[in-house]
Amino acid sequence: MIRVLVVDDSLVMRKAISRIFEQADDTTVVDTATNGEAGVEKARRLEPDVVTMDVEMPKMNGIEAVRHIMEASPRPILMLSSLTEKGAEVTMEAMRAGAADFLSKGASSATLRANDVEEKLLGKVRALADSNARLFREDGPSPAETVSSTGSREASSSSSPTSSGTDTATKGSYELAVIGVSTGGPMALQHVIPALPAAFPLPIAIVQHMPAQFTRSLADRLDSLSELAVAEAEDGMLLEPGRVVVAAGDRHLTVERREGALTTCTPAEPAGDSHRPSVNVLFRSAVEACREDVLTLVMTGMGKDGLEGARRIQDDGGTVYVQDEDTSVVYGMPRAVAEAGLADATFPLDDLPDAMQKAAGAPARP
């Protein structure tokens, strides 16, 4: 049974959120808290498997509560926030403080009662209950340090076939790098993109499962940390070395070749994919535009988005790397690709930038 602590200053929201967990077969609410201060104390005392956290609360807001919880008793925290631009900025700050993921709770309890919101809430909590909470904090230990400091994870770096990654780097010359990532992605991407040099010779296209306001905030954050130019994707952007584009949260990101040049497209269709933006949609378009000259990363995230796209990339002779289990916040998307036999190599998070540079023939960052 997954034990959940619900922190929200609204009585109506606390009841609505609690009802969802109590009606599910595998979740239960151990307690509720009306503000961040009480949430910190109850998280320490009750040791829940997952905490759901409001953003704006009296006495102590959600961001401060996240910092205190991650310092005193680290555990997965799911932020429940609004879909406003301000809400996106505050939520991203909470994730930098250590929150694992977020979900829009809308403006009323009626929004929560919508079936898709209930399913998303339960799905995220179930995934986070099995996640590695120590990886969430931006100022916390690096994934490599986390692996080496936990008994059952000590063999991660040596057991991951990093050497096979360098072997597959000669599979072909590359024209484009594509990345698919979900839960835990914002922090994972901050380990990868800023570690690449300005001379990295491939454009990079990223799908991170997030609403629109959040993807812009993520792109701005990565741009501020990186030597590469990072921006939220718009239709018609030229994909050239030194540029990184992040799919907008309400649009797909695809790649087309126009007059010989790789260019972004941001269609709303196909609507049938379970995610928008969809990793599969990006990967399929990359194969169609570049054939075998695609370097692919599948990183931390729940679900299987990217599996079929990775299969297409492999079938056409491209290269697929996956993040390993020990450094993934949620080992869902990488697991699906690895277990299908589609991964050329598996790397700990901190080794991914070096693997990308070796594959692309980029000079090491000084």
UniProtKB/Swiss-Prot annotation:
Domain Response regulatory: 3-120
Record PTM 4-aspartylphosphate, positions in chain: 54
UniProt keyword annotations, A-Z: Chemotaxis, Cytoplasm, Hydrolase, Phosphoprotein
Molecular functions per Gene Ontology: phosphorelay response regulator activity; protein-glutamate methylesterase activity; protein-glutamine glutaminase activity
GO biological process: chemotaxis
Lineage: superkingdom: Bacteria
Processing and modification events after translation: Phosphorylated by CheA. Phosphorylation of the N-terminal regulatory domain activates the methylesterase activity.
InterPro entries: CheB-like, CheB_C, CheY-like_superfamily, Sig_transdc_resp-reg_Me-estase, Sig_transdc_resp-reg_receiver
Segments of skewed composition (Low complexity): 146-169
Entry keyword Phosphoprotein: yes
Enzyme class per UniProt: hydrolase
Assigned protein family: Belongs to the CheB family.
Name under which the protein is recorded: Protein-glutamate methylesterase/protein-glutamine glutaminase
Source organism of the structure: Salinibacter ruber (strain DSM 13855 / M31)
Lineage: Bacteria, Pseudomonadati, Rhodothermota, Rhodothermia, Rhodothermales
